[in-house]
Amino acid sequence: MAAMPYSKLSRRSFLALSAALLWALRGVASGLAPSRKIPVGLELYSVRDELQKDPQGTVRAVAKMGYQDVEFYAPYLEWSEAQAKDMRKLLDDLGIHCYSTHNDEDFFSDSKIQKARDLNKILGSRYMVLAWSDPKPTLDGWTKVAQTLNSAAEKLAPAGLKVGYHNHDTEWKAVEGKRPIEVIASNTKPSVMLQLDVGTCLEAGADPVAWIKANPGRIRSIHCKDWSPDPNVGYKTLFGEGKADWKAIFQAAENHGGVEFYLIEQEGSRYPELETARRCLEAFRSTHA
């Protein structure tokens, strides 16, 4: 392949190539083995019924299982600052962290972003992740989502917060000849994390390993949710019992993706919520060991 003239290399392309080189060199230096222990947490939507009944008791139970961090989802924005401080104290007392939160699209609006920012800072979060965007019929619609993420990234940067995007299955399905997830990746700042939901990626027929390798340094968080093609099971399969090739995913994430933390997510199973969370963590540790 002929070398690309520097004059035609965009800033975004240059940064992407630089990130690829960095992670390639890191992989060589480590002998293609993980160079550090990546924490594993729980997306608290997995225990949503328990969380609604007893937020602090549920977080305590999750920490006792051995989870190292938690990801709060949209209802956290209903908290007062005092409630957020109480939760942060609990996290500190338990020795666990909140590295990210899941947010509705309007949390990034002018009317809500300040409160979301302040609560995330109290919790110690690094990333405000856009958890869902309604399917768009045109690429222009998805480009506007990318613009929203870029704008939020600029507003949150002074507070030390970054932005992320969490995929569902719809982003892998072509619109006007291109996958929306590619539009988001190519039109957002390199600082915008691409949080990979493995289960929805698999459901859409996409390859999570290929996606990680195509976006070096940007897959800083992964939702470790499995998926079964059995329509009676789907996302309710336990971690490790579905279609995902977790060893290949972990290797790609740690040698190419720049993963900083894993999050187990479960949308239900044949067991109660807390038992499901415990079983998934045990399976994760066995697979990732």
Residue ranges and their predicted role:
Residues 5-8, 14-25, 29-41, 47-65, ...:
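Histidine-acidic metal/acid-base catalytic patches
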